[in-house]
């Protein structure tokens, strides 16, 4: 199947590759958050038709392997490229070590197993693209973080990272009925966005985020925690610490609490600032984690496990993930957008590229 891309987002995961912190091949095409209109279909495609508006999950699944049949589309055994990692499971568009599949920051995207890998959108898709394009990755991923953490209505949650995924986790937690949603970051524009949806912003440049969480929870800690930063976490002085948010979460979450990790932790880093992380390793406070009886869930989001329900939340107005969009730009301005987004410049929260503009 060929999809004519009309909206494609820049993701924080793209920045790992943009900065040379992964083994992404030179000449590859970025872009795993894609929406567009079906332009051509192959003979084996029968449910999706030319002209349909679709959101394309960033996971590429087959629909019939053992993992896909269990709903684990992020870990497909058929589409995985085992030339680099022999026991690899999972594939994605324009993503390091996840197959030869080109991304959608282009005019057209080739989508294998088209019936399985496209989510048909409602009639209002064209005018509400900035809402529905979030179904390709970050809205399901933010939701997944709360699921991995085990969040239930009436519980408190602390989210480390107010980037797009962290803000989506906060949005998900609010929809799911969390009694308190705390979001840790230090960028004022992103903390303002967290506050705009009813979350409590915590500025870690003004003091220990752990202490601030404990103060807000009467010394007990949050019921649940979400890691939405990944291995390029930085302290307020600008130093990178791949283990920082993980260890802060162990301290911020209560005894017997749950932690969901969707921030990217790559298995290797060609240009690490911490030598230990060259092989994807961090110093983790396992002793305190064990002592507190906490649980951790990790891994890429199985987008198809959530995207239909989230589509319907958007369609009915219950969810409005486009609140994070700061810029809509033609595809030709992508280099400028990457420079600003990579620098975390003020006001550059989420960029939607428009190839047809």
Region spans (language model):
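Residues in the short beta-alpha loop(s) of Rossmann-like NAD(P)-binding domains
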Residues: 186-187, 265, 302
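Short, flexible surface segments
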Residues: 47-50, 153, 255
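Cytochrome P450 core scaffold surrounding the K-helix E-X-X-R motif
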Residues: 13-18
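Glycine-rich beta-strand-centered segment in the early N-terminal region that forms part
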Residues: 1-8, 21-69, 73-74, 102, ...
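C-terminal hydrophobic helical "lid"/dimerization subdomain
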Residues: 207, 220, 237, 300-357
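Glycine-rich cofactor phosphate-binding loops and adjacent beta1-alpha1 units
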Residues: 149-151, 192-293
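Cysteine-cluster motifs in flexible loop/terminal segments that predominantly coordinate metals
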Residues: 11, 58-129
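Mid-domain Rossmann-like dinucleotide-binding core that forms the NAD(H)/NADP(H) cofactor-binding site
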Residues: 53, 107-108, 118-207, 211, ...
């Amino acid at each position: 199947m060929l999809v004519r891309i009309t909206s494609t987002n820049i993701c924080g995961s793209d920045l790992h590759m943009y900065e040379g912190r992964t083994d992404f091949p030179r000449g590859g095409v970025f872009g795993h958050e894609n929406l567009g209109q079906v332009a051509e279909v192959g003979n084996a495609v029968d449910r999706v038709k030319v002209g349909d508006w679709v959101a394309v999950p960033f996971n590429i699944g087959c629909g019939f392997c053992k993992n896909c049949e269990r709903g684990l589309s992020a870990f497909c055994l058929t589409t995985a490229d085992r030339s680099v990692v022999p026991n690899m499971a999972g594939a994605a568009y324009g993503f390091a070590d996840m197959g030869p599949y080109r991304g959608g920051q282009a005019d057209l995207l080739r989508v294998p197993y088209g019936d399985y890998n496209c989510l048909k959108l409602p009639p209002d898709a064209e005018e509400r693209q900035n809402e529905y394009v979030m179904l390709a990755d970050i809205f399901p991923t933010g939701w997944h973080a709360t699921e991995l953490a085990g969040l239930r209505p009436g519980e408190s949650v602390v989210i480390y990272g107010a980037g797009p995924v962290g803000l989506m986790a906060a949005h998900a937690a609010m929809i799911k009925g969390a009694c308190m949603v705390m979001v840790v970051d230090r960028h004022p524009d992103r903390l303002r966005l967290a506050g705009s949806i009813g979350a409590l912003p915590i500025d870690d440049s003004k003091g220990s985020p752990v202490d601030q969480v404990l103060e807000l929870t009467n010394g007990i800690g949050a019921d649940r925690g979400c890691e939405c930063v990944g291995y390029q976490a930085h302290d307020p002085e600008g130093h990178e610490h791949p283990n920082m948010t993980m260890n802060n979460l162990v301290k911020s979450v209560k005894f017997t609490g749950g932690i969901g990790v969707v921030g990217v932790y790559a298995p290797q880093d060609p240009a690490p600032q911490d030598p230990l992380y060259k092989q994807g390793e961090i110093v983790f406070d396992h002793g305190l984690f064990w002592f507190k009886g906490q649980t951790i869930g990790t891994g890429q989001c199985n987008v198809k496990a959530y995207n239909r329900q989230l589509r319907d939340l958007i369609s009915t107005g219950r969810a409005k993930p486009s609140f994070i969009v700061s810029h809509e730009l033609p595809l030709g301005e992508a280099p400028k957008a990457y420079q600003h987004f990579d620098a975390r410049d003020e006001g550059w929260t989420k960029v939607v590229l428009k190839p047809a503009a």
